Amino acid sequence: MQYQVDTHTHTVASSHAYSTIHDYIAVAKQKGIRLFANTDHGPAMADAPHFWHFVNLRVLPRMVDGVGILRGIEANIKNIDGEIDFFGDYLKQLDIVLAGFHEPVYPPSDKATHTEAMINTIKSGKVDIITHPGNPAYPIDIEAVARAAAEYGVALEINNSSFEVSRKGSEANCTAIAKAAKEFGTILVMGSDSHVAFSLGGFARAQAIIDEVAYPPSRLLNRSPSALLAFLAARGHETVADLIPLFSDDEPCC
């Protein structure tokens, strides 16, 4: 099954990634990806792009060769209050805001602190998707996080990269997250967390977990471009309005 949406990618603007926007578009066309989000790391990361990078994302075209591009960020959760490293009206210029824990910005501490920080991020209203919440370096109260995400309409990510090149040992946590999401009605999304274009749309390990717990396809944001765009519009991203008509006739892949 080929999903047509990938919400989590990094370009050479984050210097530990290796592909350009052009590279991603080329691979998207090859793989049948119709919509992807450009979500480079937030400015608090040492090798992240400058703040101006995110302000100027508006120069990216909406569609190139039939592939839609979302202008976004993977922000960093900075503290227990759930603050992130992007702010104010600038957030409104973005189509999609991801956020997660990253060791160089917010070192791991303990389960209670991680849980409070993640839930406060969810409650802030600034973040659409929590990235790699299954990271074993940051244990959380999974049920509490899933309940909060369901209540505030924030999606939790099943991060495919966590099973391949980073965050080793995430499988059990991600399975528990998927089960809790199924129970509490939490929205899930699969993210490739691609740092090279060849990984775009690579969801095999994440999909195996989704299938294992029989998570409802109707709540999975990857099911169609229109599903993701409707989610973002409902969360107040007026910037996606010009993309919505371009995908109005799409069909869910599952």
From Swiss-Prot:
Details of cofactor binding: Binds 3 Zn(2+) ions per subunit.
Residues that, per the record, bind Zn(2+) 3: 74, 102, 132
EC code: 3.1.3.-
GO CC annotation terms, alphabetical: cytosol
Keywords: Hydrolase, Metal-binding, Zinc
Family: Belongs to the PHP family.
NCBIfam families: PRK09248.1 (NF006702)
Protein's UniProt name: Probable phosphatase Sbal_1472
Organism from which the protein derives: Shewanella baltica (strain OS155 / ATCC BAA-1091)
